[in-house]
């Protein structure tokens, strides 16, 4: 939605054992892949039985996280434009409409179309046409542990002491900061991976930093490091905005967060995995008329949500308990040889048994505290907290924009749709403003009519499907779609008659309140973040006359009141599709669910979100009478006539998304 985008800057600290000096550290990256089209990324939670001593996942028994796998992909259709509030361009030019950044627990790679000369390529286990090279999940399965875009939760290489300032991260082109020998034995690599996971002691958070220094290239800069209980607490930041501030909530810094965020045109995606609280946060912000509103949401909404959920899904006592456990574990790790001998001696004195009993007691207390917290969770209050977080974020945005109205009146035009999903254990909380959607893939009820539909589909597709699936062994009936689509969100657009009636009832004196299926002939959505020119007359009057609307009265034409929904996961729930509205330009809810279901059956090692993006582009090209590559050769901006910016996140809800039909 819209036609603009912003700059991307990367600021974070080193991960070494020493406190960093307050100076910038720049690393030039060699020949990255073209990132202008979009990205595919994934997050696969490690199996706690394989890495049982990992500090990150040691609380698996006391923190329930239902999801197992996250697959995401974004593609841009709009050109790259700078923020209207930027005083200068720190990179000298804006040349990327898409960018991605994350901690090392995420793997990502730019979308790379298959060369024309390669000819038609079909996936090994099914008749699915390919347009892009392998995504990060498929590469991980194909390449094994030597591939840096694999499925490990952290970097394979243990940082060298000479490079302690370099905090290794999952760059989108898949290259490490330090090029080392890749001719290592498998045992050595696994040993390093396990050692790295066991010794990982740094916590990382994503937070916006206000100041940005000049640089001609993509670089790495140290920003801030704190020493907490003899450990470095690393604060990492990715700036899409030049006018943001660092949230100083100490409790947020004490978390162990894995995060990813990216842009595609004017879409923004934010994924935060909180190992500390056992929740997953996903935000998709579909901007329009400029990049400032979605950038502001990307930088500010999650910290406000976190603060509003205090006392509901987390509290200070948990943070304090974690800090004490952290301090205690550090003392254990730094014990001397004499202390180790004393430990062995205590074993013979049966003191070990008493310590084991004490450990069991503490674990039971933690489990009991968690269970009690779950029973006391008021879902209505959680949803209200999400709503309050959005309200406070928009108020802060409009207040800031109001102070800049004389210099940047175009801020009155900029807005964004909002889709937020918060998963805590088996509870899903969804908040949306606009027309982005959350669609749940559920196992259908085995009733007569559904069985009849399956029979019809099986008969219709028999000739076309069976010929293509000769190489796929096993039960062919599993290929027949058997999942239904359940939309958790409510569309706020002029396509919904209730929304149109609401606006007309609020403006009885304005016959042009909804014209040409748009609010005041301007906006398709009926609710949005920002877009002040449709909310207050003063914002409309600040615009150039050619952009002004005929504002009648003082009541707002659109609002930012979200739709809220709570869903308790059950045995029938399989996966959740979160997406901006660009996906549903070519898919219905049912088609999207069926496409993902069929794909993960035929291609268990593939990337479902990337597949949806790919299929969307195939459909857009076919509708326009061109092939896949011809569509992608159209410059961004002009390509917006054929498809919108699209951001998709597919979350597995059954513990393991990938199951083979073989």
From Swiss-Prot:
EC number annotated for this UniProt entry: 3.1.3.16
Modified residues (Phosphoserine): 153
Catalytic activity of the protein: O-phospho-L-seryl-[protein] + H2O = L-seryl-[protein] + phosphate; O-phospho-L-threonyl-[protein] + H2O = L-threonyl-[protein] + phosphate
Phenotype seen when the gene is deleted: Plants show abnormal leaves altered in shape and curling.
Cellular component terms per the entry's GO annotation: nucleus
GO molecular function: metal ion binding; protein serine/threonine phosphatase activity
Residues bound to Mn(2+) 2: 286, 581, 644
Cofactor(s), by name: Mg(2+); Mn(2+)
Compartments (UniProt record): Nucleus
Principal EC category: hydrolase
Listed GO biological process terms: leaf development
Domain PPM-type phosphatase residue range list: 249-653
Note on cofactor: Binds 2 magnesium or manganese ions per subunit.
Keyword Manganese: yes
Keyword Transmembrane: no
Positions with a binding annotation for Mn(2+) 1: 286-287
PROSITE patterns to which the protein is assigned, alphabetical: PPM_2
Top-rank taxon: Eukaryota
Gene3D superfamilies to which the protein is assigned, alphabetical: PPM-type phosphatase domain (3.60.40.10)
Tissue and organ expression note: Expressed in seedlings, roots, leaves, stems, young inflorescences, flowers and siliques.
This protein's UniProt keywords: Developmental protein, Hydrolase, Magnesium, Manganese, Metal-binding, Nucleus, Phosphoprotein, Protein phosphatase
UniProt note: domains: The conserved PP2C phosphatase domain (250-651) is interrupted by an insertion of approximately 100 amino acids.
Family per record: Belongs to the PP2C family.
Function: Involved in leaf development regulation.
Name of this chain's protein: Probable protein phosphatase 2C 4
